[in-house]
């Protein structure tokens, strides 16, 4: 009889693995929103220019998602995870040293997105294998909660650091790089469950996207909309003269809510029929974004951040569950790959479009953008009928 590691050791491994999403998403992607006000002021950017850096990061994520399978086949899942962690920390460090060169910043944000995709995808593979061995969803829940941890840490540290000193933005990137480097060291052995090489890459099933077009459209609207809120939230608060304490508390609450989200939504996503969970998540996102538009009173902004944090990471999980229910098992991976392309396309276009809109109508337009697109996605999702069977991929 083969025995796995002791329970305490397994939990320790799962927590350390969660530092992958914490670094790849929380630090390297979403924390940029905290730096936008300082960089915009110091570098005299338009909001469209600020949004384009998120667009570059999202494009890098798409490239990384495409590259993850062949790289994992070549190097192994564990090595790919570690490589992604090192590249993520390095990209953040180079961000700190680049200076004012806009083109260089775009390239580095693209590299950070690519590295982040390698980390997030391989962490998911390792966590999935751990979940199968443990016969528990805990490894997956803990792993994906890591993104919220990275957001909470960033939100606690960066606002006091930058404060009324926008010229410190390179130091902000340096702090994120140091945190990502520490996460790399701590998580290094957490990839032990991913030594084996990956299996053959999946064929992207565009046919499934066509047959599941209402789900794909809702996902596209979410991807195009959600990213505007977290990219421009700090800029919106700065324009409304929010204090450092309010900004820090807002981001900390958003991150902690995101940590709790996987455990909160796992049962509804698996138990509710059809797209009810997806509709509820998107409706919650829309309402949370709109709340901060009504008033910038601290209580309302805090409620908005909590509502956003507790919903936005649940949408990809709900999409995954819908796809698994609608297509044959042999087509799961290819269908999810196709939906990843849909998601990446939306979140690549969204930040620039929302930023350009905000340049004309003010930073509040970015929150309205999120509320409108996610609200439209909720309406579409509410009309989706439950699949009769997992038959799309069958002859």
Q: Where are these predicted regions, by residue range?
A:
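Extracytoplasmic gate region of multi-pass secondary transporters
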Residues: 32-33, 211-252, 259
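Conserved MFS/SLC helix-loop-helix module at the cytosolic interface between two early adjacent transmembrane helices
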Residues: 63-99
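Helix-to-loop junctions at the C-terminal end of transmembrane segments
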Residues: 64-77, 261-273, 358-359
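Structural signature of the two symmetry-related core transmembrane helices
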Residues: 79-93, 276-291, 371
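Helix-loop-helix hairpin linking two adjacent transmembrane segments in secondary transporters
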Residues: 101-104, 133-192
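Cytoplasmic helix-loop-helix junction between adjacent transmembrane helices
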Residues: 108-147
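C-terminal transmembrane helical hairpin of 12-TM major facilitator-type secondary transporters
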Residues: 275-319
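A late C-terminal transmembrane helix in Major Facilitator Superfamily
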Residues: 327-363, 367-370
């Amino acid at each position: 009889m083969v025995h796995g590691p002791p329970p305490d050791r397994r939990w320790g491994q799962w927590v350390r693995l969660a530092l992958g999403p914490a670094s790849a998403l929380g630090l390297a992607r979403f924390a940029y929103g905290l730096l936008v006000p300082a960089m915009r002021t110091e570098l005299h950017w338009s909001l469209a220019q600020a949004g384009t850096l998120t667009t570059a990061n999202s494009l890098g994520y798409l490239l990384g998602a495409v590259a993850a399978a062949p790289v994992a086949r070549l190097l192994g899942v564990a090595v790919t995870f570690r490589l992604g962690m090192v590249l993520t920390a390095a990209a953040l460090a180079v961000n700190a040293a680049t200076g004012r060169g806009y083109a260089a910043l775009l390239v580095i944000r693209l590299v950070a997105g690519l590295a982040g995709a390698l980390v997030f995808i391989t962490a998911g593979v390792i966590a999935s294998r751990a979940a199968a061995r443990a016969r528990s969803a805990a490894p997956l829940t803990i792993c994906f909660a890591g993104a919220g941890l990275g957001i909470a840490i960033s939100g606690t540290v960066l606002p006091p650091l930058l404060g009324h000193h926008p010229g410190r933005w390179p130091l902000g990137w340096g702090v994120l790089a140091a945190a990502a480097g520490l996460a790399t060291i701590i998580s290094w052995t957490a990839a032990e469950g991913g030594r084996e090489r990956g299996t053959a890459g999946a064929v992207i099933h565009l046919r499934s996207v066509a047959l599941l077009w209402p789900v794909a459209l809702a996902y596209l609207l979410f991807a195009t909309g959600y990213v505007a809120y977290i990219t421009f939230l700090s800029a919106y608060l700065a324009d409304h003269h929010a204090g450092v304490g309010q900004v820090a508390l807002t981001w900390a609450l958003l991150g902690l809510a995101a940590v709790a989200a996987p455990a909160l939504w796992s049962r509804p996503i698996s138990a509710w029929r059809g797209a009810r969970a997806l509709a509820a998540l998107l409706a919650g996102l829309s309402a949370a974004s709109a709340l901060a538009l009504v008033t910038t009173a601290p209580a309302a902004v805090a409620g908005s951040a909590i509502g956003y944090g507790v919903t936005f990471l649940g949408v990809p999980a709900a999409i995954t569950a819908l796809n698994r229910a609608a297509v044959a098992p042999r087509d799961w991976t290819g269908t999810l790959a196709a939906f990843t392309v849909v998601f990446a396309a939306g979140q690549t276009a969204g930040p620039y479009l929302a930023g350009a809109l905000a340049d004309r109508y003010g930073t509040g337009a970015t929150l309205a953008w999120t509320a409108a697109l996610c609200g439209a996605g909720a309406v579409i999702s509410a009309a989706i009928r439950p699949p009769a069977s997992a038959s799309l991929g069958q002859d």
